[in-house]
Amino acid sequence: MNYLVIYPGRFHPFHQGHMASYDWLTKQFGENNVYIASSNVQDPETSPFEFGDKVKMATKLGVPASHVVNVKNPYQATEITSMLSDEEKANTALIFAVSAKDAERFNFAPKKDGSPGYLQPVPDNKKDMKPMTKHGYVAITPTVNFRVKGADANSASQIRKLYRDGNGNDRLAIITDLYGTPDPELKAVFDQRLGVNEPAEGIIYGQEAVFAGDNPVSVMREDRAHKLQENIEFMRKKLRALREKQDYIEEHRPRKK
């Protein structure tokens, strides 16, 4: 029996915890049989990264680019399963890999007639697995904590918060902790997607400079700039609180069965 393993997820961002799951799956089912499935759906707060960004992150950690697939629905991933011929499907076991947190997405209840549903947990003995024409299977990957800025981390939302709240040195350290090196390309991606490189203050000062032509106006500009800076910081705090609230809602939203 051959294996086709699909590791679905949002991956905003793809991090060392995800890579640990990928490595575990390759040891269980073979490196050539494991595919990461993710979509290009974006949301500025909870899903900020493009699919191409995720490919950069995953390949930086060692996943072959050909094994990171853009799909419409990661938890079906028909773009991957359709790569097999009917003959291959009849001799291939299909496995979806999820963390314990996401396992509730899957329902192992029997059909109305009492027969087993299509999706089943991976059996203790892999020799008992049926081909994907009869059943699909769900493997629950171990949860792995990793260190970011000297503290344990295990979620993408936690990483996004740390990055947004940090300064330039903090953000470079986070990139190094996540990907092994202070990769400038990945840092630029994070800065852009997480909205931490907006030159708001520079734009405001530039506009003021255009209209300030003499000393009295320059003195007034300095006072206005101080108040504007206070307003900017206030709005940043409000935006940060909103982002944290949206991350909390996303993580605790009931999943469809």
What are these regions (language model features)?
Residues 1-213, 234, 256:
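Nucleotidyltransferase catalytic core that binds NTPs
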Residues 249-257:
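Long, low-complexity, intrinsically disordered segments
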Residues 196-223, 229-236, 241-244, 250-251:
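Glycine-biased, low-complexity coil/linker segments
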